[in-house]
Amino acid sequence: MPNPLIPANRSSEKYQRILDAAVAVFAEKGFFVSRISDIADRADVADGTVYLYFKNKDEILASAINTAFDGFMIRARTELEKLSSPTQRLRRLAYLHLEALGANRNMAVVFQMELRQSTRSLAEFSHQHLVEYFNLVRQAISDGKTSGEFRPEMPEKIAANCFFGAIDEMVTSWVLSEKDYPLAHAADPLVDILLNGMRPATR
């Protein structure tokens, strides 16, 4: 049953301000030690205002991740629909993934580190949202097998896991690095290695 105290309209500026503040606080302090009061202070609202929008800290984390991911998926689907080549679709998806998190280090920290410390939140996110991402990858791989761009015997599930895993590790390495380099620049070489392996190009 919906909480009658939580506003139906979550598109307000104050709602987004609380989400942005939460991402910053979670990234700086860590999810488990962060308090609602920390988020309220960062958002410049009263503690009670946060509770008008969210029941607890877990719901704030889920809402922040889901809102960001939904926006990413809308852009990804829109851009990939313009590309007929499976290879180009994978390249573009890798670029968009790295670009999105590379542009927001706080969100990258929350997604790579804090979300994964909450088993429940990670399971819910994977079940509800990550499957959409993998569907885009597996569709590109399937189309590539059909068109002859990719090996027909290649297992799609394993290939999709390798694709996501490689990008995911690039983001984690960037988050942990003290160097602030353009993360999206890794997209092309990463996809080249995935598609072509380490063998020299044939002449």
Predicted feature residues:
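Amphipathic alpha-helical segments used for helix-helix packing
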Residues: 101-121, 173-176
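Amphipathic C-terminal alpha-helical segment
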Residues: 99-103, 134, 139, 143, ...
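Amphipathic alpha-helical packing segments from all-alpha helical-bundle domains
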Residues: 70-74, 121-147, 157-161, 165, ...
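Basic, helix-initiating cap at the start of DNA-binding domains
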Residues: 1-29, 34-42, 59
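Hydrophobic alpha-helical connector segments
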Residues: 63, 77-106, 156, 160-163, ...
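Base-recognition residues in the alpha-helical recognition helix of bacterial helix-turn-helix
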Residues: 27, 51-55, 67, 113
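Alpha-helical DNA-contacting segments of helix-turn-helix folds
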Residues: 61-68
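Short hydrophobic/aromatic patch on the recognition helix
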Residues: 22, 43-54
